[in-house]
């Protein structure tokens, strides 16, 4: 937990989730504070239906809790952070409505506050889903750091909701002001996106994949996953296999096709990702599968898994960090049975082999190219 966020409604001690004393990244930034200052200075009425979209760690929702906002997020971690930050502020979390991007949005929205996400696709999808609840009098304000707001960002607001302009920058943050146009004729929501995989990627070659908005590389198979699919282990005899950080689920689905007797668990902290994995699996496989939105393997019993397959992210929103990968590796070690294996795909420069040796006492290089490595660690 770092310095508190000072707002017109008070100062709030905020933390990311899960809280890690080694993590020096803040749970709020200048754009959160800028948006809250603007709401107070402009006298924006907050007595109606207030919706907060994309609140990264609950900063906006916590500061506005007295107005009983509805938060909509794609992130399990952001949702849990919001619960804990509300508790720190002495607010009963049940007084705030917490929805996911897969839930039905409110029918009427009087104030829409948008924390601009890293994914333009997710922003596009969510604005389409929220548009029916936006009316002529809805106050729409977006917020983000200058480096996060582009011409393409503004065009999405204009194309889906109405005329859009930006504020002056303050502390490298900027606001977006959108005036809803009830007569606007918008194109249909293009999400989810479905396509067939190319040849040469193992058992899933030529098969259909579903990507909901916000999933990494939603319009094509990313090169890291392509490399991983070519070097997946034979898991014959494995009872339970985990696709950890599953994204659209192609890795776990490939395992299900080659080892139909194995139960595959798909895990991701993104609700959009797990929905994508569920559809990808059901379109291609007939085996047994479980789908879990959560913080890695924290909800999985110890010593209950035979193989974990992992392509860990190394970004948290705009920040680069290895905290997520380390948490995934430690969670995998706890969940694996003795003799169980963790297989990891990663960029060469990230040095995951050192982390695996430190944690498991071993690390084997299975495959590599100029950009990626596939590593294997065995739980003793």
From Swiss-Prot:
- What family does this belong to? Belongs to the methyltransferase superfamily. RlmG family.
Q: Which GO cellular component terms are attached? A: cytoplasm
Query: What name has this protein been given in UniProt?
Result: Ribosomal RNA large subunit methyltransferase G
Might you give the EC number(s) for this enzyme? 2.1.1.174
Which GO molecular-function terms appear in the entry? Answer: 23S rRNA (guanine(1835)-N(2))-methyltransferase activity; nucleic acid binding
> What is the stated purpose of this protein?
Specifically methylates the guanine in position 1835 (m2G1835) of 23S rRNA.
What superkingdom does the record give? Bacteria
Instruction: Tell me the compartments it is located in.
Output: Cytoplasm
According to UniProt, the reaction catalysed is: guanosine(1835) in 23S rRNA + S-adenosyl-L-methionine = N(2)-methylguanosine(1835) in 23S rRNA + S-adenosyl-L-homocysteine + H(+)
Q: Which InterPro entries match?
A: DNA_methylase_N6_adenine_CS, rRNA_m2G-MeTrfase_RlmG, RsmC/RlmG, SAM-dependent_MTases_sf, Small_mtfrase_dom
CDD domains reported for this sequence: AdoMet_MTases
Chief subcellular location: cytoplasm
Pfam families for the chain: MTS
Keywords of this entry: Cytoplasm, Methyltransferase, rRNA processing, S-adenosyl-L-methionine, Transferase
The organism of origin for this protein: Streptomyces avermitilis (strain ATCC 31267 / DSM 46492 / JCM 5070 / NBRC 14893 / NCIMB 12804 / NRRL 8165 / MA-4680)
